[in-house]
Amino acid sequence: MHPEWRGQVIADLNFELPALAHGTRARIRSTYEYVDFLEEFLENLPELTQGYPEETRITAPIETWSDDFSIAIAGIPSMVNDFTGGSFMETHYHSQFDNDTYYDEDVYRLHHELFGLLLMAIDRTRVVPLNFAGTFQKAKEALDLDWCARTEADGESLAQALDEAAELAQQVYDRAAAINRGQAPDEDAGRLERQLLNLFQQTQDTFVRIDWYGNVQFPQESLQQSLELLHGAAQLAYFLLQLVQRALYIRPLETGGRRLALELFSPPKARQA
């Protein structure tokens, strides 16, 4: 990895199995911040090679299956042709069964046309088109206010702060989009881009975590999952304790074992000489 790329490179485009048909549609998987730009890009596409029966879609966030995740958390906004759908990854990928039988000419051409046009669209921008509004909204959606209340954490203030951050981020994105469309002065384009790339690194450091299975999540999600598991364990322990108490106290009494039930919970008496 090149540390000097951080703050300079506006996009990393990764290609994984671009000649393999994954599901019924092509998908561009990206960080949350590029989603709005990519969806706008899809709206203005010309007719491309028909590699799939359904239209191309955008999905987020980046997954840990490929190098673009490492590049994203290093501070470079990344995207990849989504390749994790279907059973191929579990049964054929990186094995002797991964051969030219699965080469699809139309899918290959579609991915090259799609990402070639995308590369040119990104290159035409004056300001990196990152929108952090979606990131903050997703962070809010992942916040469990019930657990915040039960642990006396100020979840409401955090949710409000995320709403305000999302609103401000949308205004900044609208400003960048106007510059990129030539509808606003671009004297501060360079400064704005540097600020956005710096913010991208900060959001990656602050909001991106992975769980034991490599799934990407927000920091609070792992804590909330731990609380749920601990709560469930405590409930189970209480339930088992109740069962043990019932077994030791009630059943012996029902069978006439009153003396046995009492002796189980009192120290044995010394034998008389």
Where are these regions (language model features)?
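Secretory-pathway/membrane protein signature
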Residues: 1-273
